């Protein structure tokens, strides 16, 4: 199923998901710097593997996907399947509602 078929995302619920499942490796604030994973500020409309100052896997650079709702929705289901060879060890979010919520949060928090 694609993002267009996903339930409406709730940014508040998405923030909770981010804090419990993503924040140990990612920051969203402008200028917050990188952790184990890259800072996600300015994520929407950016090509994978291009955040300045972060050392990406060749897989992330070579995928050359532009991050937006549809690509994030597919990626967050199973990151290692979407970008084989990615350094991101996160297993993914199986529930469409959780992915929609996280994307709604990221759209606000990374802008």
Curated annotation (Swiss-Prot):
- Gene Ontology BP terms: mitochondrial electron transport, cytochrome c to oxygen; mitochondrial electron transport, ubiquinol to cytochrome c
Q: Which residues bind heme c?
A: 22, 25-26, 88
Where located? Answer: Mitochondrion intermembrane space
Q: Extract one GO molecular function annotation from the record.
A: heme binding
Q: Name one GO cellular component term.
A: mitochondrial intermembrane space
Entry keywords, A to Z: Electron transport, Heme, Iron, Metal-binding, Mitochondrion, Respiratory chain, Transport
Q: How is it modified after translation?
A: Binds 1 heme c group covalently per subunit.
Q: Which PROSITE patterns match?
A: CYTC
InterPro entries in the record: Cyt_c-like_dom (IPR009056), Cyt_c-like_dom_sf (IPR036909), Cyt_c_1A/1B (IPR002327)
Family note: Belongs to the cytochrome c family.
Describe the function of this protein.
Electron carrier protein. The oxidized form of the cytochrome c heme group can accept an electron from the heme group of the cytochrome c1 subunit of cytochrome reductase. Cytochrome c then transfers this electron to the cytochrome oxidase complex, the final protein carrier in the mitochondrial electron-transport chain.
* Name of this chain's protein: Cytochrome c
């Amino acid at each position: 199923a694609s993002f267009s078929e996903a339930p409406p995302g709730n940014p508040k619920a998405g923030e909770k998901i981010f804090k419990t499942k993503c924040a140990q490796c990612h920051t969203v604030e402008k200028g917050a710097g990188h952790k184990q994973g890259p800072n996600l500020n300015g994520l929407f409309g950016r090509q994978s593997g291009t955040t300045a100052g972060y050392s990406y896997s060749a897989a992330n650079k070579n995928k050359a996907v532009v991050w937006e709702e549809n690509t994030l929705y597919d990626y967050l289901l199973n990151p290692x399947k979407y970008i084989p060879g990615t350094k991101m060890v996160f297993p993914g979010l199986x529930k469409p509602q959780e992915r929609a919520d996280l994307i709604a949060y990221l759209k606000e928090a990374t802008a």
